[in-house]
A protein has these predicted regions:
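Cytoplasmic juxtamembrane interface segments
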Residues: 15-31, 176-187
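Alpha-helical transmembrane segments of polytopic membrane proteins
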Residues: 9-14, 84, 304-307
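Short phosphate-coordinating micro-motif centered on Lys-Gly-acidic
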Residues: 171
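Hydrophobic transmembrane alpha-helices and their helix-loop junctions in integral membrane proteins
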Residues: 94-97, 103-104, 131, 135, ...
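Transmembrane helix-loop-helix hairpins at membrane boundaries of multipass inner-membrane proteins
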Residues: 2-9, 19-145, 220-228
Length: 373
């Protein structure tokens, strides 16, 4: 039985949170905040165990037929993806529980803000307005449904084995994050959510242009085919630069960092604790996978620029963190600085530097996640 369950381990880990997110909404609405919390926690815990069990093998992969146009839909958990995948789901699982008291307080605040004034009938009796309990139940249902979709978007991005699949997960991760900031952030939440959406979306579109250039040149979007193919020299550098810029926005590296302090400062704390420790580091993972692994020659040519960019990001983030008076913004700028270390490690073209960058992601995810809690 266990073996049969493990056959589709990664498929379950990625798609169960997406498929069961409507159920989280229904449970929240019908049975309340606590039930929705425990349901989300239990589901993510199960998925985390699947990911950890699958990572025991050196390389674990699953492939499924998809459209012929885009190649194969695959999920790959290897030595590079495993630390990222495990950290993302461990953090999501813990934060599902941490959300319970924090978001309950937030929903109560929102109810006071948004509670409609009682409407009076012509005879002077008040019509019943929405009760606090109903309001909290509805809000927690929506919150946990979005939380689950956000979690699976991050994991899917790390496990993808195909450029189009990577891009789809990349966007799936962005939309719930935008809604979570827009619904429950601190004011002016809508403007900050739009700014976050605009910045990260523009980054994603630039990334897609790089993907299309490579995919159309090779004739396949599958990582395995790209790895073996000779990409024509005239598109190599422009495609690599487009991918690096697109990922630089996700990394919040210097020059593309503007959105992070705002999104971080406004987002509800459990979401800030995912944005900074888990989500922005996915940009570094993608640099490893897409630039270091697939375009080694271009990577060697551009590495000096990555190093300079990394050092600039490191010092800028650190200096700006010292000037903030809001603790969440301090964390945001310190995260920008940490991403500079990752870029610096990736730019070093040495095994130690690359291993150090991956270790940095794990320690940053753990440390920053704990700081927020």
């Amino acid at each position: 039985e266990l073996e049969r369950l493990m056959e589709y381990a990664l498929l379950q880990a990625v798609f169960l949170p997406l498929l069961l997110s409507p159920l989280a909404y229904i449970i929240g609405r019908k049975f309340g905040h606590t039930a929705a919390t425990w349901f989300t926690f239990g589901l993510l815990l199960y998925c985390t165990i699947l990911v950890i069990t699958a990572s025991i093998d050196e390389t674990y992969e699953e492939h499924y037929p998809w459209t012929e146009l885009f190649g194969e839909f695959g999920l790959l958990l290897d030595g590079l993806a495993a630390p990222f995948a495990i950290m993302i789901y461990v953090l999501c699982t813990i934060l599902a529980l941490y959300s319970k008291p924090y978001m309950l307080h937030k929903f109560h605040e929102f109810f006071k803000e948004q509670a409609p004034k009682p409407v009076y009938q012509s005879d002077g009796t008040a019509l019943e307005s929405i009760s606090l309990e109903k309001f909290v139940n509805r809000q927690s249902g929506v919150y946990y449904a979005l939380f689950l979709v956000f979690s699976m978007g991050m994991l899917g991005t790390v496990l993808a084995t195909n450029l189009i699949e990577f891009y789809i997960f990349f966007e799936v991760m962005l939309i719930p994050a935008f809604l979570l900031v827009g619904f429950w952030g601190d004011r002016p939440r809508r403007r900050i959510a739009l700014m976050f959406f605009f910045w990260t979306h523009v980054g994603a579109v630039i990334l897609l242009l790089g993907f299309l250039a490579i995919g159309l040149d090779v004739g396949s979007f599958d990582f395995a085919d790209i790895n073996e193919a000779d990409i024509s020299a005239d598109i190599l550098v422009p495609a690599a630069v487009a991918i690096i810029i697109g990922l630089g926005v996700k990394l919040a590296a210097f020059g593309f960092h503007i959105w992070l302090p705002y999104a971080h400062g406004s987002a509800p704390t459990p979401i800030s604790a995912l944005l900074s420790p888990a989500m922005i580091g996915i940009g570094a993972y993608a640099l490893f996978r897409l630039i270091v692994e697939f375009l080694p020659q271009t990577y060697a040519d551009l590495s000096i620029w990555l190093t300079i960019w990394g050092v600039g990001t490191m010092f800028y983030g650190g200096a700006m963190a010292l000037m903030q008076d809001d603790i969440k913004r301090v964390f945001a700028y310190s995260s920008i600085s940490q991403m500079g270390y990752l870029l610096f490690g990736i730019g070093s073209i040495s095994t130690l530097g690359l291993a150090g960058a991956e270790m940095m992601y794990v320690s940053h995810a753990l440390g920053k996640g704990l700081l927020f809690m």
